[in-house]
Amino acid sequence: MSYFKNLFNGLLSGLKGNNKEAPFYYWEEYSCMSALVPENYSLTEEVFVNIEALDGIKIKYKKLPHKKTAGKLVISYERKDFEVGFFLGDFPVHEMRHWEQQYFTEENKEKISSVKKSLNIFMKFEGNSQKCYYLQLKLIYAMIPEMVALFDESAKKLLNKKWVELAVKSNLLPDPINLFSIHAVYDKNEVWLHTTWIV
């Protein structure tokens, strides 16, 4: 968690209008995902154009990241408003292999291994978690369809780009199992199941 905690320091404060450090429990409030970006990727106003082209989504406020302040979107979706924060940051891809839960070809793995940065997107879920997860995937794919892969930090899953593409183009909501992971945790001769997710 320390990597994402460091990334969020000061960025959530920019979104919230204060200068406090991001709380360690930020992952309990925000669904956090990181799209692994290809080399020479740049974040431009085009992301807003792509989002505005999505059916059923209306942008009410938009701002690109500036210095140490996260970018911000306020969107209307199914009669609800959602705040979405986003920013580019360095990405420690060597830490992600442990969370690989989908199939990746050797070519996929080579591309992932060469990634140095990610587009990080965080939002609060309001109402139906499946619909919010689907919305976040649609926003991310619209912002960066050329992503190399997607790391869902809240569910601790490294997702194949093709899976993301199929999910956002489907008329069906992702299965609930996609929203969480269950891990076996061992400590002091005891084993228990640990769940990571955002609801």
Task: Describe these PLM feature segments.
Residues 53-62, 141-153:
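Structural alpha-beta junctions
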